[in-house]
Curated annotation (Swiss-Prot):
Binding-site positions, substrate: G414, L415
Bound cofactor: record note: Binds 1 [4Fe-4S] cluster per heterodimer. The cluster is bound at the heterodimer interface by residues from both subunits.
Gene responsible for this protein: bchB
Protein name (database record): Light-independent protochlorophyllide reductase subunit B
Keywords, in A-Z order: 4Fe-4S, ATP-binding, Bacteriochlorophyll biosynthesis, Chlorophyll biosynthesis, Iron, Iron-sulfur, Metal-binding, Nucleotide-binding, Oxidoreductase, Photosynthesis
Length: 504
C-alpha cells in the first residue's frame, strides 16, 4: 500500500459503481464503512449527474466491529430490495470492509431474494478501478446470458452491440452519440448498448448480434472475450478515436456487412485540410508527451504522429493490464513506454523528456503547469471541466475535429503569449508607446516642476506581473498616488497601497 495525495484510479468497487450507475434497474449493495460514501460525489459533483448512484452502503462504524456486521449487511440488502425494487442486484465489499471477510455474496444468497443477485469478488489491494468495472460488466453479462443458446444469425441484417460506455467515463456520452450516428450511415443496426442505459434483461439479448464493438477495452474487453468464446461473436477492437482510426473502424464495419464505405462519410471532418496547409508547418516536429489510460494514450499518439506531425517524446499509461499494448505502440515511435501509477514518476519522466506539449490526465495538467508546459487533458481521471454540458466527443469524425482543436490550441495560444513576452520591452511596442497610427500631442507647458518619482527594480518587476492590458493604468495610478503622498521612490508596498487607495 502507498500513501499518496493522488491516484489515477480508485479501488475496484468504484469501477463496480460506475457500471451499476450506468445501467437502469440495477442496484449495488456495498459493505463499507461510513467514510466510503464519498464515492457519491464522483457522480453528482464531478460528472454532474442529476441523481445519486444506485448504491446502498452498510455504513458500519468502529463500534459495530465488535458486534455482528454480517447481520448489518443482510439488513441492508433486504432494505434495499424493499425500497428500490431493482431488477437485479450486485453485492460486494469496499477495500476497508474486505478486511473483515463477511462474504457479502453468501450472505445475500441466503436471503433468497426473487431477483438475480450477482456477487463480486474484487481484490481491492491488488486491482483498481478499471479492472473492477470490467469484472463487474463481465459478471453481469455472464449471469444474464447463462442458459441462452447461441442464436442462428443467418439471413438477418447485420447487427452489433456497443460495449464499454459507462458512468463517469471520459466523453463516453458524446462518443456514443457519434458512433451510433456513424453506424447508422454505414447501414448497421445496434442490438444492445451496455452498460450505459441498459437493463439487466437487455444483456440477455447480447448474443443475438453478429459482433461486439469494444469501444473502451479497459471496461469491455473481458466481457467481449467471454462472448466471443461462448457465442462465437466477432470482436471489433478498433477504437474510432482520430481521423485515421475512424476510417479503419468504418472499413472494419463495412467488411462485416459486405458493403462499401459511403463516399460522403467524411463530410464532417474539418481537420485534414489544415494538416496539409502551409500554416501547419509551425506544428510539425513539436515534441509531445502522452500519458493516460491505454486506449486514449495509444489513440492520441497515432493522431499526434500521423495526423498533425508531432514528434512523440514520451508515451505511457497507468493501466498495467494493457502494458503490452502500450509498449508495442511506443516502439512505433522509438520511445520507451512508461508504465506507472505514481504521479511523481510521471512528473520526472515529463521533466526529463522536455516536451513542448503534454497530453494527459488532470494530474498532468498540474504537472505541466508547474513545469511551464502547455497541456491538454485527453484521458480520465479528470475534473469537472472535462465533463462538459456541451457535445464534445473524441470518437468519430466530429471527435477528430474536437481533438484537432484540443491538441493545437495550447501551442497556438502559447505562441501568442511568447510573442507578447518577446516584444514587451520593444521601443515601438512596449506598454508606454503610443499607437503608431496616432499623432503625438504637443506637450503642455508645465507651470511648476512636479515631484519626480522613481521605481525600485523590485517594484518594476512586480508591475510586470500585472496583465499587460491593465498595466498602464496600474502604473499611472501608482505614480499619481506617489506624487500626492510625496513618495519619491516607488516600492512594492507603494503599488499595493495605491491599489488599496483607488479600490475604495
Amino acid at each position: 500500500m502507498q500513501l499518496t495525495l493522488w491516484t489515477y484510479e480508485g479501488p475496484p468497487h468504484i469501477g463496480a459503481m460506475r457500471i451499476a450507475t450506468a445501467m437502469q434497474g440495477v442496484h449495488y449493495v456495498l459493505h463499507a464503512p461510513q467514510g466510503d460514501t464519498y464515492a457519491d460525489l464522483l457522480f453528482t459533483m464531478i460528472e454532474r449527474r442529476d441523481r445519486r448512484p444506485p448504491v446502498t452502503y452498510t455504513t458500519f462504524q468502529a463500534r459495530d466491529l465488535g458486534s455482528d456486521t454480517a447481520t448489518l449487511f443482510k439488513n441492508a440488502v433486504r432494505d434495499a430490495y424493499d425500497r428500490f425494487k431493482p431488477e437485479a442486484m450486485i453485492v460486494g465489499a469496499s477495500c476497508t470492509a474486505e478486511l473483515i471477510q463477511d462474504d457479502p455474496g453468501g450472505l445475500a444468497a441466503a436471503l433468497g431474494l426473487p431477483i438475480p443477485v450477482i456477487p463480486l469478488e474484487l481484490p481491492a489491494y491488488q486491482r483498481k478501478e478499471n479492472w473492477g468495472a470490467a469484472e463487474t460488466l463481465y459478471h453481469l453479462v455472464r449471469a444474464a446470458t447463462n442458459g441462452v443458446a447461441t442464436p442462428d444469425r443467418t439471413g438477418r441484417p447485420v447487427a452489433v452491440n456497443i460495449l464499454g460506455p459507462a458512468a463517469l467515463g471520459f466523453r463516453h456520452r458524446d462518443d456514443l452519440i457519434e458512433v451510433t450516428d456513424l453506424l447508422g450511415k454505414l447501414g448497421v443496426s445496434i442490438n444492445v448498448i451496455a452498460p450505459l442505459g441498459a437493463r439487466f434483461a437487455d444483456l440477455a439479448r447480447i448474443p443475438a448480434a453478429d459482433a461486439n464493438i469494444v469501444l473502451y477495452p479497459e471496461i469491455a474487453g473481458t466481457a467481449a472475450a467471454y462472448l466471443a468464446r461462448k457465442f462465437g461473436q466477432k470482436t471489433i477492437t478498433t477504437v474510432p478515436i482520430g481521423l485515421n482510426a475512424t476510417r479503419d473502424f468504418a472499413a472494419e464495419i463495412a467488411a462485416l456487412t459486405g458493403s462499401t464505405v459511403p463516399d460522403d462519410l467524411e463530410s464532417q471532418a474539418r481537420s485534414s485540410w489544415y494538416a496539409r496547409s502551409i500554416d501547419s508547418t509551425y506544428l510539425t516536429g513539436k515534441r509531445v508527451f502522452i500519458f493516460g489510460d491505454a486506449s486514449h494514450a495509444i489513440a492520441l499518439a497515432r493522431i499526434a504522429a500521423t495526423e498533425i506531425g508531432f514528434t512523440i517524446a514520451g508515451l505511457g499509461t497507468y493501466s498495467r493490464e494493457f502494458a503490452r499494448e502500450v509498449k508495442s505502440a511506443a516502439a512505433l515511435y522509438n520511445v520507451e513506454a512508461l508504465i506507472s501509477d505514481d504521479y511523481l514518476t510521471v512528473e520526472a519522466a515529463i521533466a526529463a523528456a522536455q516536451p513542448e506539449l503534454v497530453l494527459g490526465t488532470q494530474m498532468e495538467r498540474h504537472i505541466a503547469k508547474r513545469l511551464g508546459i502547455p497541456c491538454a487533458v485527453i484521458s480520465a481521471p479528470t475534473h469537472v471541466q472535462d465533463f462538459p454540458a456541451r457535445h464534445s466527443p473524441f470518437a468519430g469524425f466530429e471527435g477528430a475535429n474536437v481533438l484537432f482543436d484540443t491538441l493545437t490550441h495550447p501551442l497556438m495560444m502559447g505562441l501568442e503569449e511568447h510573442l507578447l513576452g518577446m516584444f514587451r520591452e520593444d521601443f515601438e511596442f512596449n506598454d508606454q508607446a503610443a499607437p503608431s497610427h496616432l499623432g503625438a500631442e504637443a506637450a503642455a507647458p508645465v507651470a511648476t516642476a512636479p515631484i519626480l518619482t522613481g521605481w525600485e527594480p523590485s517594484a518594476e518587476a512586480e508591475l510586470k506581473k500585472i496583465p499587460f492590458f491593465v498595466r498602464g493604468k496600474a502604473r499611472k495610478n501608482t505614480e499619481l498616488f506617489a506624487a500626492e503622498h510625496g513618495v519619491t521612490l516607488i516600492t512594492i508596498e507603494t503599488i499595493y497601497d495605491a491599489k488599496a487607495h483607488f479600490s475604495r
